[in-house]
């Protein structure tokens, strides 16, 4: 299989011949040490694909990092998921609102009956660092509307349904 690869923004395309199917992540891992930023996404034949996407036929691949709009959105979404998990682990079942991006950051609000303490904020931040260090995969799962309503409701997010 032939892959026309652009390893980073602005780089020339390279022609690769690969014997067996490979994921975008496996391909990106070959180039990552030479790249200035972590690969977060790939554009395969004009369509953005996750790192788990399996390349199994001739194609054109552009590796994308956070300098691109779409990869930056993936980064922000991943950060939001890590934040939500950390809040849940530290504070329990609290509703969290993640608002618009503000000046390269996210504005969030944790809905609690009592004000959040400095210690709790530090604990959430510490838990986020632990989750990042654990390098856990974020796996996309697809649900029916009914399943999604049930799941979001169980996590105290009825507005998501």
Label each PLM-derived region with a short phrase.
Residues 102, 112-161:
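Non-catalytic interaction/regulatory segments
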Residues 1-80, 84-86, 91-105, 126-130:
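Ubiquitin-like/PB1-type beta-grasp interaction modules and other compact soluble beta-rich domains
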């Amino acid at each position: 299989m032939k892959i026309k690869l652009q390893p980073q923004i602005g780089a020339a395309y390279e022609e690769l011949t690969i014997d067996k199917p490979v994921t975008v992540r496996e391909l990106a891992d070959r180039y990552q040490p030479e790249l200035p930023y972590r690969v977060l996404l790939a554009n395969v034949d004009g369509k953005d694909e996750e790192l788990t996407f399996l390349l199994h036929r001739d194609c054109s691949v552009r590796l994308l990092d956070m300098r691109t709009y779409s990869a930056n959105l993936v980064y922000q979404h991943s950060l939001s998921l890590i934040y939500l998990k950390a809040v849940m682990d530290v504070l329990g079942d609290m509703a969290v609102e993640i608002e618009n991006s503000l000046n390269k950051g996210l504005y969030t609000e944790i809905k609690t009956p009592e004000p959040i303490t400095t210690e709790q904020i530090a604990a959430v931040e510490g838990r986020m660092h632990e989750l990042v260090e654990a390098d856990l995969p974020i796996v996309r799962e697809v649900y029916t509307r009914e399943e999604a309503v049930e799941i979001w409701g169980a996590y105290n997010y009825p507005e998501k349904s």
